[in-house]
């Protein structure tokens, strides 16, 4: 099983990176939080890998930290959550927000992640509530991005993972949209990032 992959970034997209090592290119599925921290094309990256094997598929899922990989593995232990949905969940909510929402039983916040229905959210709370560590650095009562679309939430999550404060990040996303930025992730993310700098 592949557990660690170090190589050069050949291509990168919000949920996918192509890493070349030893003359071989590996397509690795990643959450937005990993995408935002990748080096420029040609830069070296080191990813913690979860190898998913089925009879017809061998898929690699990559994370920059062991903690994020461990959270991913906890998510896929929940009945009804596979690797693809787990990556969407990690892209839809920052890790600290996700842990806090599960520990508090905030089903209504979890169902805002694309692909997560009420039953899945309830199973996440039931099966993981006591297995997750307390989230650190979380402001109690921080405003949630309830009015944002799934793409907006991806951009917000990416900004939070870069260390932006939630109020400024959310305001930047709204301003970027109001200024006519494209509704696609990358242009919206670039414009919002300019606004928070």
UniProtKB/Swiss-Prot annotation:
First-listed, main subcellular location of the protein, grouped into a coarse class: cytoplasm
Segments for region (Domain III): 153-197
Record-level GO cellular component terms: cytoplasm; Holliday junction helicase complex; Holliday junction resolvase complex
Taxonomy, superkingdom: Bacteria
GO molecular function, one term: four-way junction helicase activity
Keywords: Cytoplasm, DNA damage, DNA recombination, DNA repair, DNA-binding
Compartments it resides in: Cytoplasm
GO biological process terms, semicolon-separated: DNA recombination; DNA repair
Domain notes: Has three domains with a flexible linker between the domains II and III and assumes an 'L' shape. Domain III is highly mobile and contacts RuvB.
HAMAP family per record: DNA_HJ_migration_RuvA (MF_00031)
Family according to the record: Belongs to the RuvA family.
Cited NCBIfam families: ruvA
Subunit relationships: Homotetramer. Forms an RuvA(8)-RuvB(12)-Holliday junction (HJ) complex. HJ DNA is sandwiched between 2 RuvA tetramers; dsDNA enters through RuvA and exits via RuvB. An RuvB hexamer assembles on each DNA strand where it exits the tetramer. Each RuvB hexamer is contacted by two RuvA subunits (via domain III) on 2 adjacent RuvB subunits; this complex drives branch migration. In the full resolvosome a probable DNA-RuvA(4)-RuvB(12)-RuvC(2) complex forms which resolves the HJ.
Name under which the protein is recorded: Holliday junction branch migration complex subunit RuvA
Species this chain originates from: Solibacter usitatus (strain Ellin6076)
Lineage of the organism: Bacteria, Pseudomonadati, Acidobacteriota, Terriglobia, Bryobacterales
């Amino acid at each position: 099983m592949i557990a660690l992959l170090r190589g050069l970034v050949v291509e990168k997209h919000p949920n996918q990176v192509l890493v070349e090592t030893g003359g071989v290119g590996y397509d690795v599925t990643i959450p937005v939080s990993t995408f935002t921290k990748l080096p420029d094309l040609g830069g070296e990256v080191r990813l913690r890998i979860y190898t998913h094997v089925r009879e017809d598929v061998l898929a690699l899922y990559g994370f920059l930290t062991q903690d994020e990989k461990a959270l991913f593995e906890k998510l896929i232990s929940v009945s009804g959550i596979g690797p693809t949905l787990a990556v969407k969940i990690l892209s839809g909510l920052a890790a600290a927000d996700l842990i806090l929402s599960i520990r508090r039983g905030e089903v209504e916040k979890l169902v805002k992640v694309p692909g997560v229905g009420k039953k899945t959210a309830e199973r996440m709370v039931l099966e993981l509530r006591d297995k997750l560590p307390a989230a650190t650095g979380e402001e109690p009562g921080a405003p949630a991005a309830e009015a944002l679309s799934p793409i907006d939430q991806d951009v917000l999550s990416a900004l939070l993972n870069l260390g932006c404060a939630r109020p400024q990040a959310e305001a930047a996303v709204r301003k970027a949209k109001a200024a006519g930025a494209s509704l696609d992730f990358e242009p919206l993310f670039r414009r919002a990032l300019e606004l928070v700098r």
